[in-house]
Every structure is written in C-alpha cells, then in structure tokens.
Regions:
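Generic non-transmembrane alpha-helical segments
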Residues: 31, 52, 56-60, 84-94, ...
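Conserved PLP-binding catalytic core of the aspartate aminotransferase-like
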Residues: 47, 59-92
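Short hydrophobic/aromatic beta-strand micro-patches
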Residues: 3, 73-75, 113-115
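Residues that cap or initiate secondary-structure elements
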Residues: 8, 78-80, 102, 118
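Short beta-strand/turn micro-motifs at beta-sheet edges
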Residues: 18, 98-101
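PLP-dependent enzyme catalytic core of the Aspartate aminotransferase-like
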Residues: 91-94, 101-135
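PLP-dependent aminotransferase class I/II
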Residues: 1-58, 62-65
Length: 135
C-alpha cells in the first residue's frame, strides 16, 4: 500500500486484494512522489474532480459508492454488464478495473479512477453512450 499508516500492512494482512505494480509504474510513482508541488496540487484538486465526476454520473443506471480516495466504485445494473463495459471502454482508450474476482464484489462492479477533468468528461461521455446504446 502506498501512503499507508505505519503498521497498517501488517494489520490488514490478506484482508485486502493486492495489485501488483511493475517496474515502469513503480518508477513513475517514485518520480511523482518526489514532486512536492504536484502532490500538494493533486491533493487539493482530486476531491473536487471526484465530486464533479460522481455528480456527472448521476442519472446513469449504476450505483455510485461514497469515496474519499482517487477512484469511484460503481455497481452496474446487472452481473452481465461489467465485462462488456470494460471491453467497450478499453476499445476507446479508457481503462477501468473490473472487480469480478475481488472478494466481496463481483462481475457487476467496476472501479474508475478520478482523472483530470478532460479524462473524466471522456469517461462520462462513453458511459452515457454505452448505456444509451446497450453496447
């Protein structure tokens, strides 16, 4: 876990699913964490971007779970929608996490990152298209 309180990893053990981080991603993370101005700006802006993204998703046939981090957990309207949605978005250059195999979730859950405003607008636009056309 990145940014966890000391000892948190030992206490959580196997209670949460892990995500492996490859060396290129780890190098990018080290570079991003070394830029203090970027970190401060991001911490200030992400909550605003997250709220805007969540409000933009209202009216779509999905449940938006409350979040205090840089992603939103979404429950889709059926167990058969998640995989189709992940492929649909992927073909449009939008990567989301399908939660089919995460304990306590299932194939009707996806996790979307809170991006920059233009990235969030693209995500919302494509989600609207997906649900409008049932692709």
């Amino acid at each position: 876990m990145v940014g966890r309180p000391r000892g948190c990893g030992e206490r959580t053990g196997n209670a949460i699913a892990s995500w492996r981080v490859g060396e290129p991603a780890a190098a990018a993370l080290r570079a991003a964490l070394s830029d203090r101005k970027y970190l401060a700006r991001t911490r200030r802006l992400v909550p605003r971007w997250r709220e805007k993204l969540a409000s933009s998703l209202e009216g779509l046939p999905l449940k938006i779970f409350p979040s205090s981090v840089n992603f939103l957990l979404l429950r889709l309207p059926g167990w058969d929608v998640g995989e189709r949605l992940v492929h649909y978005l992927g073909r449009r250059g939008i990567l989301v996490r399908w939660c089919a195999y995460l304990p306590g979730l299932g194939p009707d859950f996806v996790r979307v990152a809170v991006g920059k405003p233009d990235q969030n607008r693209k995500l919302v636009r494509e989600l609207r298209r997906f649900f409008r056309h049932g692709t």
